[in-house]
Swiss-Prot record:
GO terms for cellular component: cytosol. CDD domains: RRF (cd00520). One of its GO terms (biological process) is cytoplasmic translational termination. It comes from the Bacteria. It is found in: Cytoplasm. GO terms for molecular function: ribosomal large subunit binding. It comes from Xanthomonas euvesicatoria pv. vesicatoria (strain 85-10). Belongs to the RRF family. Responsible for the release of ribosomes from messenger RNA at the termination of protein biosynthesis. May increase the efficiency of translation by recycling ribosomes from one round of translation to another. Its main location: cytoplasm. The keyword Cytoplasm applies. This is Ribosome-recycling factor.
Length: 185
């Protein structure tokens, strides 16, 4: 029973870190990345469709993205969706392809994005601590029901704390890596 609680806590903490990593891929750094456009939805065939399902997105020359549409009639819709996104990018239509040139980030914008990254990291830490609290509560409930001894419960809580410390360290490393990526000119 305690092993299951610890495994569940570890799985949930790992998912929280993965969610942070995914969330940070959408924050623009100096380099072009197709993941930057993951959040963009296009009005296609009567529904909001993710951009990567109606086009292939590739990096060109490090600072620009090339969007090749599967259906050439959707150029205006894709262009409109990019303008509507809060990425601050201006699409350039070249024939049947859309180019997005990423301007270099200003120092002020880098600091702003760095704060945003730090905030996302803090949110992940809070989620991890909540997972720890839930797991410890399950252990205490088992102790109250006399399903485990006090020593087993204390040992399980120590193990859960070690998992929490490791997960928070991982979050710090992910945030630090993203901040370094942002500050690299």
């Amino acid at each position: 029973m305690l092993t299951q609680i610890k495994q569940d806590a570890q799985t949930r903490m790992t998912k929280s870190i993965d969610a942070l990593r995914h969330s940070l891929t959408t924050i623009r750094t100096g380099r072009a990345s197709p993941a930057l456009l993951d959040g963009i939805k296009v009005k296609a065939y009567g529904a909001d469709t993710p951009l990567n399902q109606v086009a292939s997105i590739s990096v060109s020359e490090g600072r620009s993205l090339v969007i090749s549409l599967f259906d050439k009639g959707m150029i205006k819709d894709v262009e409109k969706a990019i303008y509507a996104s809060d990425l601050g990018l201006t699409p350039t239509v070249v024939g049947t392809v859309i180019r997005l040139n990423l301007p270099p980030l200003t120092e002020e914008r880098r600091k702003e994005l760095s704060k945003s990254v730090h905030g996302e990291g803090e949110d992940s830490k809070v989620a991890i601590r909540n997972i720890r609290r839930d797991a410890n509560q399950q252990v205490k409930d088992l102790l109250k029901d006399k399903a485990v001894t006090e020593d087993e419960a204390r040992s399980a809580e120590d193990d859960i704390q070690k998992l929490t410390d490791k997960a928070i360290k991982d979050v710090d490393e992910v945030v630090k890596g993203k901040e370094q990526e942002l500050m690299t000119v």
